[in-house]
Amino acid sequence: MAETEIPTQLYLISPLDVRGGFPQRLERALEAGRGVVTAFQFRVKGIDQHEAARLAEPLQAICAAHDVAFVVNDSIALAKRLKADGVHLGQDDGSPKEAREQLGREAQIGVTCHASRHLAMEAGEAGADYVAFGAFFDSATKDKGDAEQPTLELLEWWSQVFEIPCVAIGGITPDNCQPLIEAGADFLAVSGAVWSGDERAAVQAFAEQIAAA
């Protein structure tokens, strides 16, 4: 991919619990991240689709008001029900082709590719709009298990060879994100670093690192 003037952007991932005051926290994070936060992933586990949709609706409205893409994790069916901007697929969540058939041409479809060049190329060939590599660091959100840890060289290779954007994920903080930005990550997917403390301050700290790159 040729050098681009578009800087690295933030891709916020929700905590598993989005009840209570989370909509207000999301609002504050997006206000602090204008021009930097461009996508939000709705990621909940262990609840039925009806409850997930109920929890998603106010968050989706907040994202729309801030011109931030609302992406559903794992579930093509929920993304279709919500008319979400996109869906993020793990390796066991269906194919980009299936998602495209269900969600239409305009949907943003992302695929988890761990540390695999092969999976990323397959995803691109299948019509993915972005590929996600990780976990780069220890993370409560992305359990690496025995998975191979991706390298900075993987990001560099992808960004130089392919036009499809790449997302770096897994344990990313303002303190460790600079090498990922320099290696060519188009997006930093972040969760714990934002929601475990002051979301405004965290987003602003990421924005400062991006601006300094």
UniProtKB/Swiss-Prot annotation:
- Which cellular component terms (GO) are annotated to the entry? cytoplasm
Entry binding sites for 2-[(2R,5Z)-2-carboxy-4-methylthiazol-5(2H)-ylidene]ethyl phosphate: 139-141, 171
Presence of the UniProt keyword Signal in the record: no
The record's annotation in SUPFAM superfamilies points to: Thiamin phosphate synthase
* Associated pathway: Cofactor biosynthesis; thiamine diphosphate biosynthesis; thiamine phosphate from 4-amino-2-methyl-5-diphosphomethylpyrimidine and 4-methyl-5-(2-phosphoethyl)-thiazole: step 1/1
> Which GO biological process annotations does it have?
thiamine biosynthetic process; thiamine diphosphate biosynthetic process
**Residues that, per the record, bind 4-amino-2-methyl-5-(diphosphooxymethyl)pyrimidine:** 41-45, 73, 112, 142
**How does the cofactor attach, per the note?**
Binds 1 Mg(2+) ion per subunit.
EC number annotated for this UniProt entry = 2.5.1.3
* Cofactor or coenzyme needed: Mg(2+)
Q: Which cysteines are joined by disulfide bonds?
A: none
Alphabetical keyword list:
Magnesium, Metal-binding, Thiamine biosynthesis, Transferase
Q: Which domain of life does the UniProt lineage start with?
A: Bacteria
NCBIfam families noted in UniProt: thiE
Annotated family:
Belongs to the thiamine-phosphate synthase family.
Q: Which named protein is this? A: Thiamine-phosphate synthase
